Amino acid sequence: MAALVVTEPGRALLRAGTERLLRGGIQELLRPRHEGNSPGLARDFSLSQNRGTVIVERWWKVPLAGEGRKPRLHRRHRVYKLVEDTKHRPKENLELILTQSVENIGVRGDLVSVRKSLGRNALLPQGLAVYASPENKKLFEEEKSLRQEGKLEKLQTKAGEVTVKFLKSCRLEVGMKNNVKWELNPEIVARHFFKNLGVVVAPHTLKLPEEPITRWGEYWCEVTVNGLDTIRVPMSVVNFEKPKTKRYKYWLAQQTAKRMAPTSPQI
């Protein structure tokens, strides 16, 4: 079957527009339509170009004609089947290298694949990214190796930026028991970060107030993410009201029994 490429011009609209232009109706075509006017029988002529292309193929094969003669076409030879509609073809993404940290996309030096509209209308004009050419890839690879060697300042990772943003909106609650004397330390705070907020925090990245915390109340703690950004998180030290260990449940039962037991009168 022979392939045939046909455009989408709208021949009837083009013929009608040409006639109106020949009659001097160019001003009428350029005049904007008022809101509320219902379109008439004749459709408006569009001056914009339609660049869509549809690739079709004949359903019936045209027989070969004799030498010097045109092939004889029947009505069945004007039946086509769709091969591809380039207007609705899936659009390819654009590969870029970020020059700065962009929220929800990446950090400097990351090779990202974004929509062409986002790259050409936002990232490239604002200088947030460059094209992923071989020269630019080599340049950022050298910069990355220098950062790993410690010759350049380190940058926060994408996961680190997400962690910093999350910690800025958090409040930590630390539950402490009332049956023993206690003093809050970084190990206890780190466990409550994972238990209550789901964030893994190393104890050496935590900083508590200089005065020892031995009572319930409102305090703060500072968390350093990847050694770059430090966030102060509000912290509430409250009474531990939901016992889970058998030892603490046994102690609570003993205290309740002592309060409920009748006291014998002294003689």
From Swiss-Prot:
Q: What keywords were assigned to this record?
A: Mitochondrion, Ribonucleoprotein, Ribosomal protein, Transit peptide
Q: Name one GO molecular function term.
A: structural constituent of ribosome
Q: Name one GO biological process term.
A: translation
Main location, first listed in the record: mitochondrion
Any one Pfam family match given in the protein's UniProt record, by short name: bL9m_N
Supply the gene name.
Answer: MRPL9
Using the record for this protein, list the coiled-coil segments as residue ranges, or answer none. Answer: none
Regarding protein family, the annotation reads: Belongs to the bacterial ribosomal protein bL9 family.
Q: Does the keyword Transit peptide apply?
A: yes
Q: Where in the cell is it found?
A: Mitochondrion
Q: Where is the transit peptide?
A: 1-52
Highest taxon of source: Eukaryota
Q: What does the subunit comment say?
A: Component of the mitochondrial ribosome large subunit (39S) which comprises a 16S rRNA and about 50 distinct proteins.
Q: What Gene Ontology cellular-component terms does the record carry? A: mitochondrial large ribosomal subunit; mitochondrion
Name of the featured protein: Large ribosomal subunit protein bL9m
Give the residue spans that cross the bilayer. Answer: none
